[in-house]
């Protein structure tokens, strides 16, 4: 179900408050967040946000091309195990 056009995109208030405070002070430090659903705003460009992936925080540097996407899109939750077969089973066939 899509979000109503009357509503603004979701951003966790605490995260946005921290970003705005850092912009006022011209600070650049990493911010930890568990809010993967937060939408990236233009005010966040240039900051590094550590997004939680379920076991650790993944640092994500925000660029202009990321605006409008969600933070969780840039912190994958599943680790990929390769599909290669064991050498012994490959030799038998």
Curated annotation (Swiss-Prot):
One of its GO terms (cellular component) is small ribosomal subunit. Keywords: Ribonucleoprotein, Ribosomal protein, RNA-binding, rRNA-binding. GO terms for molecular function: rRNA binding; structural constituent of ribosome. PROSITE patterns: RIBOSOMAL_S19. The keyword Ribosomal protein applies. Gene3D superfamilies: 30s Ribosomal Protein S19, Chain A. GO terms for biological process: ribosomal small subunit assembly; translation. Protein S19 forms a complex with S13 that binds strongly to the 16S ribosomal RNA. HAMAP family: Ribosomal_uS19. Belongs to the universal ribosomal protein uS19 family. This is Small ribosomal subunit protein uS19. It comes from Rubrobacter xylanophilus (strain DSM 9941 / JCM 11954 / NBRC 16129 / PRD-1). The lineage of its organism: Bacteria, Bacillati, Actinomycetota, Rubrobacteria, Rubrobacterales.
């Amino acid at each position: 179900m899509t979000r109503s056009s009357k509503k603004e995109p979701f951003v966790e208030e605490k995260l946005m408050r921290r970003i705005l405070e850092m912009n006022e002070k011209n600070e650049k430090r990493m911010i930890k967040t568990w809010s993967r659903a937060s939408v990236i705003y233009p005010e966040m460009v240039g900051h590094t946000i550590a997004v939680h992936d379920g076991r650790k925080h993944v640092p994500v540097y925000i660029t202009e091309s990321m605006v409008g996407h969600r933070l969780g899109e840039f912190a994958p939750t599943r680790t990929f195990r390769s599909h290669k077969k064991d050498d012994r089973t490959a030799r038998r066939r």
